[in-house]
């Protein structure tokens, strides 16, 4: 069974220590609820990942663990087969002892768009909401973060993260918790909170913004990336049914509307630092994610539209600062 004891130990003398009042019981219940299904099979695979300490580790410019020269061809093939059990791999890419995991998303491209605009992560405590397999968490560590915590309720994503962590060495202060943000108490402790690719999946985007705010210390920084559409501060798209074949997309605001939402939630220093139309090169099917991808979600006769006729995916990154609460509104 995947253990969270090292995380408890790392936060016992940190700004997150009060989380220990509730977190062990929540994760204990999660473990009891997942004794069956795919998780036990995946954990057996994780237990087979015994490899020498990597001769190269790079989280600054990529996520690379090992040069590939430490393993024989047979050992590398075995590793590739083990990692293949965790398909589909959506966020990456990873280079693991010479095994190149070409994921559906070029998450490194998103990181390169975002990182020049954020406050330096050196010595900061960071939360990544909806972290997926944890690719960006490793890049946050590469920027010098003191602690990185990722939350995502997916057992598969957790096992993908654990596979990478076991190959990297478990001593790194990067931890995945299989939780949704609604399961977190107001911690008021993180220096930076990332929410990238989550907001449009939430039925109540304002509530989600408040949940993000509750995790930040006063003066902490929010990095919010989500789907947007063109328009003024009153423009919000609510898909009638599906958007890009997804049935869990609820609200797509304009950039101005999104910034207004953040202002209403008592954030300051709100700025849009990037707007980018998702390209077919950034999101596509690969050997490691052989299912449908972006090209299948767009109108074959007009890639500026989804198959439903809505504007094709465009993503904006907004950065904002948690303000002191306005006591007149409490």
Swiss-Prot record:
Q: Which UniProt keywords are given for this protein, alphabetically ordered?
A: Transferase, tRNA processing
By its UniProt entry, which CDD domains does this protein fall under?
A: AdoMet_MTases (cd02440)
Q: What GO biological process term is on the record, naming one?
A: tRNA wobble uridine modification
Q: Which GO terms describe its molecular function?
A: methyltransferase activity; transferase activity, transferring alkyl or aryl (other than methyl) groups
Report the domain of life of the source organism.
Bacteria
Gene3D superfamilies the record matches:
Vaccinia Virus protein VP39 (3.40.50.150)
InterPro entries with a match to the protein in the record: CmoB (IPR010017), Mo5U34_MeTrfas-like (IPR027555), SAM-dependent_MTases_sf (IPR029063)
Chain positions recorded as carboxy-S-adenosyl-L-methionine binding sites? 91, 105, 110, 130, 152-154, 181-182, 196, 200, 315
Catalyzed chemical reaction(s)? carboxy-S-adenosyl-L-methionine + 5-hydroxyuridine(34) in tRNA = 5-carboxymethoxyuridine(34) in tRNA + S-adenosyl-L-homocysteine + H(+)
Q: What does this protein do?
A: Catalyzes carboxymethyl transfer from carboxy-S-adenosyl-L-methionine (Cx-SAM) to 5-hydroxyuridine (ho5U) to form 5-carboxymethoxyuridine (cmo5U) at position 34 in tRNAs.
HAMAP family documented for this protein: tRNA_carboxymethyltr_CmoB
Quaternary assembly: Homotetramer.
Instruction: Describe the family membership recorded for this protein in Swiss-Prot or TrEMBL.
Output: Belongs to the class I-like SAM-binding methyltransferase superfamily. CmoB family.
Name of this chain's protein = tRNA U34 carboxymethyltransferase
Q: Which gene encodes it?
A: cmoB
């Amino acid at each position: 069974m995947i253990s969270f004891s090292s995380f408890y130990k790392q936060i016992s003398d940190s700004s997150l220590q009060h989380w220990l009042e509730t977190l062990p019981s929540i994760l204990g219940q999660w473990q009891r609820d997942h004794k069956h299904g795919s998780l036990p099979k995946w954990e057996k695979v994780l237990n087979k990942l015994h490899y020498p300490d990597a001769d190269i580790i790079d989280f600054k410019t990529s996520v690379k663990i090992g040069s590939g020269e430490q393993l024989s061809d047979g050992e590398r093939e075995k590793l590739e087969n083990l990692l293949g059990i965790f398909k589909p791999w959506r966020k990456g890419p990873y280079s693991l002892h010479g095994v190149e995991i070409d994921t559906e998303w070029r998450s490194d491209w998103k990181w390169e768009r975002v990182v020049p605009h954020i406050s330096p992560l050196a010595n900061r405590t960071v939360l990544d909401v909806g972290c997926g397999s944890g690719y960006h968490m490793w890049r946050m560590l590469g920027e010098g973060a003191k602690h990185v915590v990722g939350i995502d309720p997916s057992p598969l994503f957790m096992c993908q993260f654990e596979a990478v962590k076991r190959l990297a060495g478990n001593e790194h202060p990067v931890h995945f918790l299989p939780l949704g943000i609604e399961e977190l108490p107001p911690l008021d402790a993180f220096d930076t909170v990332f929410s990238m690719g989550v907001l449009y999946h939430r039925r109540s985007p304002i509530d989600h913004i408040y949940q993000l705010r509750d995790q930040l210390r006063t003066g902490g920084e929010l990095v919010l990336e989500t789907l947007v559409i063109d328009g003024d501060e009153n423009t919000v798209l609510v898909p009638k049914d599906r958007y890009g074949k997804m049935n869990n997309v609820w609200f797509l605001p304009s950039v101005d509307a999104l910034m207004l939402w953040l202002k209403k939630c008592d954030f300051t220093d709100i700025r849009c630092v990037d707007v980018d139309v998702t390209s077919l090169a950034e999101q596509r099917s690969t050997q490691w994610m052989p299912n449908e991808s972006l090209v299948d979600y767009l109108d074959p006769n007009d890639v500026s539209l989804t198959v439903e006729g809505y504007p094709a995916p465009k993503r904006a990154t907004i950065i904002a600062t948690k303000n002191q609460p306005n006591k007149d509104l409490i």
